[in-house]
Amino acid sequence: MSGCESTPETDTPGALLYLQQTPPGQVPEVFAPGKISLANRGEFASVFSADGREFIFGVSGDDRAEVFSTRLVGDTWSEPRAVVSHERYSYMDAALSPNEDRMYFISNQPLDGEGEPKDPDLWFSTRTEGGWGPPQNAGPVLNSGRPEYYVSFTDEGTLYFTSSRAAEVGDEMNFDIHASRAVDGVFQRPARLGDAVNSEGYDGDVFVAPDESYLIFSSGRPGGFGGGDLYVSFRTEDGGWTEAKNMGSTINTDGQDYCPFVTRDGRYFFFSSNRDIYWVDASILDTYR
């Protein structure tokens, strides 16, 4: 579909990509069972690098969440390991910046790195020769006194994310999707997307197409199949967004469906549901236009 397809940025043989899993059709399947999706934990918020040689995902345990990664080394995928982790605080919802020199995520770590966990902020780590550097808070332009969640980037560097900063006091669960454009590498004051996308309830976990032609996000608005459903909205000619459309029972369940991501080659749509990561052929997105 437009905005989804691009030339794969890799010379890796196709059989080695996607952890050497058998590709899905238009019915979602659990991704890499026994390797990524395990029975004794929850997995969510996944992203592949542009060249398809690194897979980053979240793992939730009993008391905190961590960011894991596996890489294709030669013709073998490495054992997944935690790359952003803390014994007390959670790190999750990872996303890569357009040039992949930074990994953004959220954390409930206080600014001074001490004391009780706090409402989540946006953080990032810079890529180093050996992996990822120490977490750094993304600062007061992106972060507010309210929780922030889930980052996604356009090719031009606009950052989409979730925040309850616009909610009235006593209505802190009214999360909305915001966008912050980068000017000369500096993020500008975030703007809330309009009511075609946002509702009076929870709207978040947004994935934006690299060319900003569509959004996929999770919402708890009335009329869905479960506690949170995935919706899609397309860019209009005047720069607005079409009325968000529920992605239906093929994608959504009676549980929580969230954390969407479409691979850079435009082939696969990933999302999280019922404590596992799922994938499906991205051509399914054409059916919602």
Name every feature range the model reports, one short phrase each:
Residues 2-3:
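C-terminal motif of bacterial Sec signal peptides marking the signal peptidase cleavage site
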Residues 8-289:
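Short, conserved micro-motifs composed of acidic
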